Amino acid sequence: MILLRYILLCLVILSGTEIRAQLSEISGLVTDANGKPIAGAFLIIRPNEKMIQTGVDGRYQFKNIPAGNHQLTCFATGKQLLNFNFNCQGSAITHNFQLNELAANLNAVEINQAREDDFGISRLRAVHDFAIYEGKKSEVIQLNDTKANLATNNPRQVYSKVTGLNIWESDGAGLQLGIGGRGLNPNRTASFNVRQNGYDISADALGYPESYYTPPTEALESIEIVRGAASLQYGTQFGGLLNFRFKRGPFHRKAELTSRQTIGSWGFFNSFNSLGGTTSNGRLNYYGFFQFKRGDGYRVNSGFEQVNAFASITYDLSAKWKLQVDITKMKYLAQQAGGLTDKTFEQDPRQSFRSRNWFMVDWNLASVQLSHKFNPNTELNIRSFGLMAGRSSVGNLERINVADLGGNRTLIEGKFENIGNETRLIHRYKIGKQLQVLATGIRIYKGNTRARQGFGSSGSDANFNYITPGEPENSDYQFPSTNLAAFAEHIFRVSDRFSITPGLRAEYIQTASTGYYKSYVFDAAGNIVTQSRADEDISRERQFLLAGVGLSYKSPRNLEVYANFSQNYRAINFSDLRIVNPNFVVDPNIRDEEGYTADLGLRGKIKSSFQYELTVFYVAYRGKIGQILKTGQPPLFSNIRYRSNIADARNIGVESFFEWQVLKSDSAGRKPALNLFCNTAFVDARYINTDDKSILNRFVEMVPRFIFRTGADLRFRKWNLHGMYAYTGEHFSDATNAVLTATAVEGLIPAYQVVDLGIGFTHKWLNIQFNVNNALNEQYFTRRSESYPGPGILPADGRAFYCTLQFKL
């Protein structure tokens, strides 16, 4: 017994010696650009999540650091944010930081205290990812802190704190995202320049900017949104920029496995599994995931199955060169229940009158980014990207008030191939004592889309083969496109608090269409009387210059006042050229849209418990593309939706957001934390300057005049409880503001309100989350569709329950 105690005592002493031997320390000095010590600078070490501040002499010291990889982040108010990766092996390390006056790195500091201060949403700093955001309205959703239902990509919850968004909710599985801001159409988020990790992911950035692929929010670190002022650096869209920022592997571990398994109503199942880490020398970081998702859907005939995979490697080639490679694969098949009329929706929103409609998407993306740091003031980024993708839809496109009696279905196929490069340069220099920043770059983009439409099979299965594949019955087109662009923006810092940021973007666009379309004349019985074929070979070039300017004033009381003006441009879509659809007709003389966006806003924080933002905006269109009702051709003379440049338009609005940290927990979590937020938008969007008196001064379609979202998040120890209320005002689906039509393609979209609830429990490596979407079982719809996945009313999901089990090893 004495011998056993002696052995145990020796083991304890030896283990303690080993632990002490592995502990390290790091210390150093933090100075400004002139070498003057900075007192009160913040330093955060991860994964310990410990934060300290420098003393009056600018020095810092961390002790008792365990062995392994660590990251040290240093920042100060109004100064640069820097990261230092290091490996501890029991020795003392010295590292000094020199912080410039303008931040160049905007990656969020992912620690609990910082997330509490940011409330789950933050703003982009002046310079981020080789672009300038000074004087622009921006929002960053921090996904690490959100309580949204991530398994379903629920946009109502994920984007609840982003102001002024109209959200389509007809896709309860999160396969496609449909959001539009400030009166812009939410259709597949086409009003935004949509990217992931800074590169394009849409079908065709010029002629078909629709997003059939949506990155899973479970894999994201953040979502960055910049309003119309992003047109100078990222593209010409009126909506601005939407960028999905993927997670990276943890810096402090060689491998970390995260697995999330979710089950829910209507046979929903989602399995998300990711692996990431950093090699022992700290030079190679990797992250990847695989996702499988399936469900039967809220409505009859609305089942789906999806697979999604992603891999990313970041390698430090040297102290100045960094390489990042991304690969993405996504594929899904979904049955589409079709639309409903107003009457059938009131009877039962879950019913379906289309059992033969299917939709398939196959998306493949690749990107290579190379960054070079010439010196602390000059950096270069070269990002190349490519897409090979396709979408196919087969089904009955007839109006929903016409029964499906069988026969050949309409098959529409799109194949997308594009490649591009963006090269960006950031340069910092001083004029007097003020640091100035220049961001400049070029873009080269080449795309090709093949669009075909013809007769598919007469069955009910997911058969995407043409009856005559060599010559489809409706159309077969190639749409090549070329885009060359150059931009420059410059922050002129007049003083410590006031800056002016002008910018220019020069664009060259060449689009072409080569192919044929066929026209048919039918008798009263639906038989073909005559048919004709027209071949086309059209090319078009455009060159133009966009300009903008931003102003920013930062008061000493943590308040910023900003103003921005930027020109915008939107090219017509390929789908506006040759798509045969019995529900709408496109004007053959349709042309591009032009206009501008203007912002005036203020934002800030009161202490660390209250943040707010108030913005007034004006969006102007010249020749806005819209849809009006017209009388169709004989013999039926049915109303049709006619798509053309119907009028000029202007959108005026006010957006406000605030969040209040009512209760703030301590570092140990022994006190409860309570956050409240409120998101409000008033928008008045009308058609002006038009010869068509039927739409003069009418409301622009798909623009709710009032949007309100509010929520609360309560955390105590290992538990969190959250709830959200969302209200969207009534709006119209066409420019004539029709209230009710027989086809249900046009009509009023009534106001609706939705309540979501959730509760979660976290213990070390385990997390359990329960969500109730649409807790009050509101029966509503957000969309009337003229084509797939309709036509007609597309109901939103009713009450649904979800349970997620997550573990991290």
Name each model feature, range by range.
Residues K63, Y199-R227, N583:
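Short acidic/polar hinge/loop motifs at secondary-structure boundaries
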Residues A319-M330, V361-Y520, K554, E613-V616, ...:
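Face-selective signature of the C-terminal outer-membrane beta-barrel domain
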Residues S222, A229-S231, L241-T278, F290, ...:
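Short strand-turn segments of transmembrane beta-barrel domains in outer membranes
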Residues S371-K373, E379-G395, K554, E560-S566, ...:
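Membrane-embedded beta-barrel scaffold of Gram-negative outer-membrane proteins
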Residues R622-G623, A673-L674, Y727-V739, G760-L809:
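C-terminal beta-signal and adjacent terminal beta-strands/loops
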